[in-house]
Amino acid sequence: MVTYGELLEIIGYTLVENDMTETICRHMDEYRGEYTNSIFGLFLEISKGLGLVCKGIEMQAFVQVGTLLRQLYEQIATAIVLQNHPETRKTFNDLSKIKTELITTNKDKNDASETLYNQKKDLISGQPRRRDFFEYGWLLEIEGCHSLGSRELLKQANLFDIAAWKEFFNNFVHNKILAIQMTDEGMSFYTNEFVYHAAIIFDRFMCAYHQATDYNFHIAGRSVRFDFENCFNEITKQRKS
């Protein structure tokens, strides 16, 4: 029977032991462009984040792992939407620059932020908070999209079925669940769940990265993607039985 440990080994082997960072940086130089850099930057953060998740699971650092997985779901969703909707990339970059300037100057708004907000605010259902607009306003470039927030982002990335789990991970972000409070059964349960959610993100990462670069995830004569899909599918069947 395939185990969660085998699934985790494949993810760690791909991202940590074989330094996926070097591969992504090489492809970033090869496909360099004003807007593609944002996508490859996300790929880089996802790869590093999943590598940390693998190490964190081994260390039973559950609070850190839960926090990382919550962030990684948003990052992979963002990469998928930017990849599938090129019309969003300019606004995404514009908002990223504005956010960076606001953070570094410790301001809530500036001329650039107000101009962009006033241009787009009528497209949004309800009364949006400026913070949500600067985080997710680029989604408005998608035809028919009038909502902002992480749930809308996951929906646009076809990841809406895990929205409830993403919210659950907030419990770790806010230290509501600590490993020291868990029974052995609880630790086993969360370890398996963390591995499975890391696998979901890794699966989407491989698909998106292959779409962007044609990279086939063959490493040292091993078809990592083939091994992973077999293991992931078997674990998924076990979970449904």
Predicted features by range, described:
Residues 1-241:
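A cross-kingdom marker of C-terminal helix-rich interaction/assembly modules
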